[in-house]
Amino acid sequence: NVEFAVKYMYYLLTDEQLDEMSSGNEAKKFAKLLAYWKPRDPTPNTPYNEAMAEYFRRIDYAFFNFQTIRERDGSKTERGKIYVLYGPPDSIESSLANGTTTETWKYSKLNKTFIFSIVSNGIYKLMEIQ
């Protein structure tokens, strides 16, 4: 579904770019979507675009796995955003200290660590990036 695909490009595009990609009929939107992903395709001589497939696989995973009571679309949560942009972390550590649940996501190759804490009703907030 082209509408769905374009809608979920919000982490990669500016508002202006998203508006532009959203304009036109379905065929034009599809052409714009493919044009965006073509230079990002790691194997441009094949019909399958691995980068595009991976991005939407992450959106799908985040949608279902990071839902909260307040946000049914888990890709829009803070953990969902990090997952969509960086993929699955190399390690996840959960801890409970002083009544606060913390989840630490480590990305070794990127040398990045994201620390989330539950702030209320199971909602994780990004507290720190190292």
Question: What residues fall within each predicted segment?
Answer:
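Residues within mature, well-folded domains
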Residues: 1-130
